Swiss-Prot record:
Disulfide bonds join 4-20, 8-22, 13-27. SUPFAM superfamilies: Cyclotides (SSF57038). One of its GO terms (biological process) is defense response. There is a cross-link at residues 1-30 (Cyclopeptide (Gly-Asn)). Belongs to the cyclotide family. Bracelet subfamily. The presence of a 'disulfide through disulfide knot' structurally defines this protein as a knottin. Pfam families: Cyclotide. PROSITE patterns: CYCLOTIDE, CYCLOTIDE_BRACELET. Keywords: Disulfide bond, Knottin, Plant defense. This is Chassatide C9.
Length: 30
């Protein structure tokens, strides 16, 4: 639920390495 400051519209989330995932075109961490 916490925004990771990254979008995932065109490319995947780089922040997946710290637990973030793509939701609604924005990367979130829980």
């Amino acid at each position: 639920g916490i925004p990771c400051g990254e979008s995932c519209v065109f490319i995947p989330c780089v922040t997946t390495v710290i637990g973030c995932s793509c939701k609604d075109k924005v990367c979130y961490n829980n």
